[in-house]
Amino acid sequence: MPPRLASPERLSRQSGLSYIELMVALVVLAVLASAVIPLARWDEKRRREERLRVHLATMRQAIDEYKKYVDEGLIVQSDVEQMGYPLTLEELVEGVEVGDPNSPDSQTIRFLRKVPEDPFTGEAEWGLRSYQDDWDSNSWGGENVYDVYSLSDIRALDDTYYKDW
């Protein structure tokens, strides 16, 4: 018996069925995509938060290291108001002379390679606190750099503000 060819109306029913299947598949993909996009945004924010934590820890460690050198007498400060802390973050980048400046053994030590960029503001600008400022103050007294914080007003994933980290 010869093979039967599909009739035109049977062909149209088959193609209609595949069109419905295509539409269902597209709807399923759209639903999955709508679930993935917020997760991707959340993941990107989490990565930026991690970079912020690392940058803050790096700068705070550099400030502490500077203070340690002053306390050990390796860095001589002429201004008593500095309380053993650097005047600016740039001082940590440019470096300070350690030891007796007249001695051939003196050397310049840099505590930071560069001031890191705040991942949420996109700038290498940070809020600064001096030793004389209140712990929660957002205005810098300018005497020294005791602490740094983000200038971002955005809320973190844990519902705190980045400037409070």
List each language-model region with its residue ranges.
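Residue-level signal for short amphipathic helical patches enriched in basic/charged
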Residues: Q14, L32-A35, D43, R47
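N-terminal leader/signal peptides at the extreme start of proteins
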Residues: M1-S15
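Conserved short-loop catalytic and cofactor-binding motifs
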Residues: A40, R47, V76-V80
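Internal alpha-helical transmembrane segments of multi-pass membrane proteins, especially GPCRs
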Residues: S15, E21-V24
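Low-complexity, acidic interaction segments enriched in glycine
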Residues: Q61-W165
